[in-house]
Curated annotation (Swiss-Prot):
Keywords: ATP-binding, DNA damage, DNA repair, DNA-binding, Nucleotide-binding. The lineage of its organism: Bacteria, Pseudomonadati, Pseudomonadota, Gammaproteobacteria, Alteromonadales. GO terms for cellular component: cytosol. CDD domains: ABC_MutS1. It comes from Shewanella baltica (strain OS195). Pfam families: MutS_I, MutS_II, MutS_III, MutS_IV, MutS_V. This is DNA mismatch repair protein MutS.
Length: 856
C-alpha cells in the first residue's frame, strides 16, 4: 500500500491510521513499526520482509474489512536483520514509540527516528570494515555527466565532471557505490545494471541553485571557489541531491562533512571499466577479493589504511613528484626497519576514521569512546617513533597526527575501563567524574545492605524464620513469608503477591525506601545520559583535527605496509623516467607468483620510442595473458608509490592503461562476446595516445578467420602507426608476426615451449622472435579431449597443411594482401554521402547533379 487515500483512513482502526500515515511518508522503503518488544510490518512490507528475511507471514485481525498481512521481528535482534537488508540494497525506516502507553488515550505516539539505507550506514555492525561505503549521485546534462560520492562513515565528499558515457562507467567501476541516486530523466540506466541500491529522485532535487545553497550552508562558506569546484556545474547538481538525501535520512547535523574535493582525471592514470575488471585490482572476475592485487598488497594494520590502499590502487598518480615522495617514505621505513614497530602501534589505533564520523553524528557508542581514548593514549609513543624519520612526506604526516592530551584525559576520567555496548542502562560514566551522579548511585547501590539489615531486623521482630526480603523488576521490593507462617505477619504488612507456597508483602517503610531507590536510579540514569551527551560537546570542537589525525594515520599505515610488502615479497623500488617507455628486468606477476604451486618464471619487457609494439605469440597456457597483465600491474604499482616485483623497473609517464583481455557475453545488455570485444577495442582505438599502455589479447577470435585476421592486423597497424601507444599485442594469427618487417617500432616476442613426442612443456619464458607453432592439439590433449578426437584432428591438420603447401605458389603474400595502400576517396561519392535529399529543392537537386557529373 504505497499510496494512501486519506479519505479511506477512517475505515481503519486508530493504530492502523497512524501506521498508514507514516507509511505514506516513507513509501519507498520498509517501515519497522515498534509495538512493545517487536517491530511489526504490515501489508506489502510484511510480504516483502517475509520473502527477504525468511520470517513468518501472519495476519493481524482485520482493518477496513480485510485481513492485514503482518510479519514481526524482536527489537533486540534488529541489527542482524538490518544487515541482511542493506546488503541487498533495501532501505528501512525505523519507527519508535516515543509516548508513554500508560498515559496515552489513543495510539501511543510514534515517530520515525532513524532511516537506514545502504549508502548512509555508520553503524560498525552494518559496515564492511575494509571497504568504503559510498553513496553516489549522478546527473546527466546535455553534454556530459555530473557525479558525486559521499562516504557518510568518514565524511569524504568527492565530485567529478565526466564528458562521456565511458568515463562515467569507469567512475562507477572505480568507486563501486552501494547506493546510487539518479534523476527522473537519466538516460543511461543500463550503466546502473548490477548495482543494488538504486534510487530514482525527483528532478527538483538536482536544481543547481538549491544545490549551491545546500553546500554553502553545510560548509559555512560564502562561495565554493576555495574548494576549486565553482565551475563544476553538473557534479554540483549531483552533490546537492546527495546532500539533501543524507540530511533527510540522518536527521541530524553533519559536522564531519566539512570539505569537498574534485576528482580530475588528468591527475591520475585513467583506467576504464574493462581495464579495472580485467586486471582484477580489488575484485576478481567472480566478484570476490581472493587473488586480486589488493589481496596481495594489503597487509595494513588498520581498516582505514586498507580502504585508503584500495583507493590508491584505483587512482594511480601521474605526478612524479608525488610518487617519489611516497617512494622516499617507503624506502626510509624499509631501510630503518621502522615499519615493524609502526605496524603494531598503528594496529592499536583501530578505525578512528569511522569512530569520528559516529562521534560527529552523535551515534557513537560507549566502546567507541573507549577506543578513541586508547588511540589518543598511544599518540606520544607514535610521535616518538616518527621523530626518528626524516623523509619529507613522513614529516608532513607526523604534523597532522598531533597529540590530544586534554581529550585523552577527559575520556580517562569520564568512561569506565570496560563500558557496556549501549548507554541505555547506564554503567558508562566512571565513579568520581560527577559528584551528583555518585550520590544518586550511592543510594541505589546501598540497597543490598539495607535489605540484608531489614531482613534480619524483621525476622527478629516477628519470629518468622521463613521471612526473606527480595526484589524483582515487576513487583519491586517485597517481604516473603511461607504460606504456613503467613498468619503470624504483623498488621502493617500489606499483601502484594500470592504464590503457590508463599505470600509476599510490603510495609510502609519498605514502600518509602523503594520509591527513594527507584527515584535515585531513574535520576542517576537520566544524569548519566546527560553527562554522556555533554561528552560529545566537549570532544567535537577537535573534530577536524581528529579527522586529520585519522587520515594521516591511514596514510602512514599504507606506506608502512608497502615497506613490509617490499621486504616480505622481494620487491624493488622502480625508477621513474621522463621519457616514454616501460623497461622491466625479471618482472613477476604479483598475484600469480603468490598462488602458483611452482616457481614463477620472471620475464623482461622493453618498450620505448623505437620499440613501441610487441607482437606476443606462443601456445595457449603458455603464459601470454599473465605476461601482459604483469606488465600492466607493475606499471600501476609503480604509480601508486609501491615497490614492484622485478629486479629492476624503469617506468616513464603514462596517461592511460587499456586492456582487451578475455571477454564473455554481456547478457544484461544483449551483447555477444564478439560485440563486447569490439566495443572495448573501439574504445582503445579512439582514446589511446602515445603515452598509453595498451594490452590487446586475441583480437578477432570471435568471428571468421579472415574477418578476425583483417581486424587484428588493422588494429595493430593503427596502434603502431597512427597512435604510437606502447602496446603488447597477443595473437594466434601468425600472419601478424610479419608486421615487424613492414613497420618500424614493431617487434616479435614469444612464450617458449618444448615439444617431446606428443607432449608439450610450457617454459613460460619470453624470448625474442615469433613462435614456431601454436601447439593447439597438444594443449587440447592436456585438457582431456578424447584421444580419438585428437587423432582425427591431427589427420585433418595434415590435410589442411598439405593443401596450403600446394597452393603456396599461387597465393598472394600476406603482406601484399594486408598492407595494401589506403583506399583513395572518390570526391563524388564523398559529396553524395553528405547529402540529405529531403532538404533539397528541385533547383538545388539539378545543380547538384551537374556538380556530381563534374566531380566524377
Amino acid at each position: 500500500m504505497n499510496v494512501i487515500d486519506t479519505d479511506d483512513l477512517e475505515k481503519h482502526t486508530p493504530m492502523m491510521r497512524q501506521y498508514l500515515t507514516m507509511k505514506a511518508e516513507h513509501h519507498d522503503m520498509l517501515l519497522f513499526y515498534r509495538m512493545g518488544d517487536f517491530y511489526e510490518l504490515f501489508y506489502d512490507d510484511a510480504k516483502r520482509a517475509s520473502e527477504l528475511l525468511g520470517i513468518s507471514l501472519t495476519a493481524r485481525g482485520k482493518s477496513g474489512g480485510d485481513p492485514i498481512p503482518m510479519a514481526g521481528l524482536p527489537y533486540h535482534a534488529v541489527e542482524g536483520y538490518l544487515a541482511k537488508l542493506v546488503q541487498i540494497g533495501q532501505s528501512v525506516a525505523i519507527c519508535e514509540q516515543i509516548g508513554d502507553p500508560a498515559t496515552s488515550k489513543g495510539p501511543v505516539e510514534r515517530k520515525v527516528v532513524r532511516i537506514v539505507t545502504p549508502g548512509t550506514l555508520t553503524d560498525e555492525a552494518l559496515l564492511q570494515e575494509r571497504q568504503d561505503n559510498l553513496l553516489a549521485a549522478v546527473y546527466q546534462g546535455k553534454i556530459g555527466f555530473g557525479y558525486a560520492t559521499l562516504d557518510v562513515s568518514s565524511g569524504r565528499f568527492v565530485i567529478a565532471e565526466l564528458d562521456t558515457r565511458e568515463s562515467l562507467e569507469a567512475e562507477l567501476q572505480r568507486t563501486n557505490p552501494v547506493e546510487i541516486l539518479y534523476s527522473e530523466d537519466f538516460g543511461e540506466l543500463g550503466l546502473l545494471n548490477g548495482f543494488k541500491g538504486k534510487r530514482r529522485r525527483p528532478e527538483w532535487e538536482f536544481d543547481y541553485d538549491t544545490s549551491i545553497k545546500l553546500l554553502l550552508t553545510q560548509f559555512g562558506t560564502k562561495d565554493l571557489h576555495g574548494f576549486g569546484i565553482a565551475d563544476a556545474r553538473l557534479s554540483l547538481q549531483a552533490a546537492g541531491c546527495l546532500m539533501q538525501y543524507v540530511k533527510d535520512t540522518q536527521r541530524t547535523a553533519l559536522p564531519h562533512i566539512n570539505a569537498i574535493t574534485r576528482f580530475n582525471q588528468t591527475d591520475s592514470i585513467v583506467l576504464d571499466a574493462a581495464t579495472r575488471r580485467n586486471l582484477e585490482l580489488t575484485q576478481n572476475l567472480a566478484g570476490g577479493r581472493d587473488n586480486t592485487l589488493a589481496a596481495v598488497l594489503d597487509n595494513t594494520a588498520t581498516p582505514m589504511g586498507s580502504r585508503m590502499l584500495q583507493r590508491w590502487i584505483h587512482q594511480p598518480l601521474r605526478d612524479p613528484k608525488h610518487i617519489k615522495a611516497r617512494q622516499q617514505a617507503v624506502t626510509e621505513l624499509l631501510d630503518t626497519t621502522a615499519h615493524e614497530g609502526l605496524h603494531e602501534q598503528l594496529k592499536a589505533l583501530g578505525d578512528i576514521e569511522r569512530i569520528m564520523a559516529r562521534l560527529a553524528l552523535r551515534t557513537a557508542r560507549p566502546r567507541d569512546f573507549a577506543r578513541l581514548r586508547q588511540a589518543l593514549g598511544l599518540l606520544p609513543e607514535l610521535q616518538q617513533s616518527l621523530s626518528t624519520l626524516s623523509a619529507p612526506h613522513t614529516t608532513q604526516l607526523r604534523q597532522h597526527i598531533g597529540e590530544f592530551p586534554a581529550e585523552q584525559a577527559l575520556l580517562e576520567r569520564a568512561i569506565v575501563d570496560n563500558p557496556p555496548m549501549l548507554i541505555r542502562d547506564g554503567g558508562v560514566i566512571r565513579e568520581g567524574y560527577n559528584s551528583e551522579l555518585d550520590e544518586w548511585r550511592g543510594l541505589s547501590e546501598g540497597a543490598s545492605d539495607y535489605l540484608v539489615q531489614l531482613e534480619a531486623r524483621e525476622k527478629e521482630r516477628t519470629g518468622i524464620n521463613t521471612l526473606k526480603v527480595g526484589y524483582n523488576r515487576v513487583h519491586g521490593y517485597y517481604i516473603e513469608v511461607s504460606r504456613l507462617q503467613s498468619s503470624q505477619v504483623p498488621l502493617n504488612y500489606q499483601r502484594r503477591q500470592t504464590l503457590k507456597n508463599m505470600e509476599r508483602y510490603i510495609t510502609p517503610e519498605l514502600k518509602e525506601y523503594e520509591e527513594k531507590v527507584l527515584s535515585s536510579q531513574g535520576k542517576a540514569l537520566a544524569l548519566e545520559k546527560q553527562l554522556w551527551e555533554q561528552l560529545f560537546d566537549l570532544i567535537l570542537p577537535k573534530l577536524h583535527e581528529l579527522q586529520a589525525f585519522a587520515r594521516a594515520a591511514a596514510e602512514l599505515d599504507v606506506l608502512s605496509n608497502f615497506a613490509e610488502r617490499a621486504e616480505t615479497l622481494g620487491y624493488t623500488c622502480p625508477e621513474l623516467s621522463q621519457d616514454i617507455g616501460v623497461q622491466i628486468e625479471a618482472g613477476r606477476h604479483p598475484v600469480v607468483e603468490r598462488v602458483s604451486q611452482t616457481p614463477f618464471i620472471a620475464n623482461p619487457v622493453t618498450l620505448h620510442n623505437q620499440r613501441r609494439m610487441l607482437i606476443v605469440t606462443g601456445p595457449n597456457m603458455g603464459g601470454k595473458s599473465t605476461y601482459m597483465r604483469q606488465v600492466a600491474l607493475i606499471t600501476l604499482m609503480a604509480h601508486i608509490g609501491c615497490f614492484v616485483p622485478a629486479d629492476r623497473a624503469l617506468i616513464g609517464p603514462i596517461d592511460r592503461i587499456f586492456t582487451r583481455i578475455g571477454a564473455s557475453d554481456d547478457l544484461a545488455s544483449g551483447r555477444s562476446t564478439f560485440m563486447v570485444e569490439m566495443t572495448e577495442t573501439a574504445n582503445i582505438l579512439h582514446n589511446a595516445s602515445a603515452s598509453s599502455l595498451v594490452l590487446m589479447d586475441e583480437i578477432g577470435r570471435g568471428t571468421s578467420t579472415y574477418d578476425g585476421l583483417s581486424l587484428a592486423w588493422s588494429a595493430a597497424e593503427y596502434l603502431a602507426q597512427q597512435v604510437g601507444a606502447m602496446t603488447l599485442f597477443a595473437t594466434h594469427y601468425f600472419e601478424l608476426t610479419q608486421l615487424p618487417e613492414l613497420m618500424a617500432g614493431v617487434y616479435n616476442v614469444h612464450l617458449d615451449a618444448i615439444e617431446h613426442d606428443d607432449t608439450i612443456a610450457f617454459m613460460h619464458a619470453v624470448q625474442e622472435g615469433a613462435a614456431s607453432k601454436s601447439y593447439g592439439l597438444q594443449v587440447a590433449a592436456l585438457a582431456g579431449v578424447p584421444n580419438k578426437v585428437i587423432k582425427a584432428a591431427k589427420h585433418k591438420l595434415q590435410q589442411l597443411e598439405s593443401r596450403d603447401h600446394q597452393a603456396e605458389g599461387t597465393r598472394t603474400p600476406i603482406q601484399s594482401l594486408l598492407a595494401l595502400p589506403e583506399p583513395v576517396e572518390n570526391p563524388a561519392l564523398t559529396k553524395l554521402s553528405n547529402i540529405n535529399p529531403d532538404n533539397l529543392t528541385p533547383k538545388q537537386a539539378l545543380d547538384l547533379l551537374y556538380e556530381l557529373k563534374r566531380l566524377s
